[in-house]
Each structure stands twice: as structure tokens, then as C-alpha cells.
Amino acid sequence: MITKHTPDKTAALIVAVFSSFLAPFMGSSVNVALPIIGKEFAMDAILLSWITTAYLLAASALLVPFGRLADIHGRKKIFTIGIWIFSIGAVLTAFADSSTQLILCRIFQGIGSAMIFSTGLAILTSVFPPHERGKVLGINIGSVYLGLLLGPFFGGLLTEHLGWRSLFVATLPLSIVVILLLLSKEMKGDWAEAKGERFDITGSVIYVTAIVALMSGFSELPETRGALLLLAGIIGIALFLILESRISSPVLS
């Protein structure tokens, strides 16, 4: 038996699927273009790796804090801001004229990605009843793997014929569709399950700093600096967990 979807459900599914496709597609396609980007900006291997690392650092470190902000202020609101940041970041990256600008733009994109991924699945679980969630979550996960699969092929194709900058412009049509749906009447509701609760700024800062230290430490091993960063990250996570256990409105519950 096929369950008839309301416009709200259909719009939410399209928004989640398209946005879940975007980041993996861009990430895997950019990896193909790294040698050409490195040659254009005369970047060594370490600096070149930061095109990917900077994005992943921002996306990973901010995932939990943005998830909490979405619970307090509304998942749709945070998601919408995220897709705007991701899209603007893509345009800025396409016009970057130095390695520094390129890496900063990727950090900006990572911030948007964190806002998208911290809310996308949560929006689906808010819109769809329990008996439908397995199917829609499966579709959503499928879009992630589709992005990873198609990224290298189309990334190579676009880079060869239109240049590496086209990779970032190519995602804009999907982003525009997502933004239009978010602004439409089909996407009713904001889904703020912790509305009115306090956001733990101190805990968030400690968490973000610890995650950045951990990821940076792993990337710099076996250097002494890498080991020190790892140690700082572990201490930071321990401090974060102790702090969160003692407050009434934790970032991670």
C-alpha cells in the first residue's frame, strides 16, 4: 500500500535529498581537481590538503552546536541559513584568486554544511511519522552515496572541459531549488523542540576547540605538534563532558 504524501512531506523529502547530495558530490569532485588547483596557485602538498581539511574541520566541529541551535530556534531556520551560506561559499570559492581566499571560502562552506547536516535528518523525522521514516531515511542516505559516486566522474568532466571553478557553480541549480522550496508554503513549520531553552555557549566553544585540536592533531602526526594537539583535544573533550553533565541545558544530551 502506497502512503499518499502531503505537500509538506514531499517538499521536506526533496529538500533533504538534494541538500544531502550536494556536499558529498562537491567534496568528491573537488578531490579530482586538487592537482590542477595546486598547480594554478603553486600550492605544496600540505597547503593543498587544507582545501579539503579546512572544509571538514568546520563541518565536523560545528555539527553538534548547530544541531542544538536548531532545536532551540527552529530546524528550518538553521537549515535555510545553512544552504544560503553553502551556496554563497560555492560562488566565492569559484572566484577565489589566491590559495588563502580559497581555503577561507572552503571554511565558510563548511559552516553552511554543518548547519545543513545537523538539521536535514531531524527535519525528516519531524515531518514523517515513525512508520515512514525507514523508507525516507534510506532514500536520504542513498542520495549521499549517489553524490560520492557521481562526484569523481562529473568532477573530472567539468574540470577538463570548463575548469575547476565550474565545480562550485555546478551545484547552484540544486541549491536554488532547495531555497525556493524552503521559502514556499509547502514547507510549513519550524520544528523547534527545545524552544525557550538556553544555549550553552561555553560548552560549545570548548567542544569546537577540542574537535579542531583532535582533527588537526591527527593530520600532523607523527610530529610533536600533532601529539600535543591530540592531547589538548582529549583534555578538551573530557572537560566538555564534565561540564555538560552539570548543566540543565547541555549542547549534547
Positions of the model-derived regions?
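Intrinsic disorder in cytosolic terminal tails and internal cytosolic loops
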Residues: 1-8, 191
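Extracytoplasmic
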Residues: 11-53, 61-63
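Residue-level signature of the transmembrane alpha-helical core
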Residues: 17, 21, 53, 84-87, ...
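Hydrophobic/small/kink-forming positions within alpha-helical transmembrane segments
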Residues: 21, 57-61, 91, 95, ...
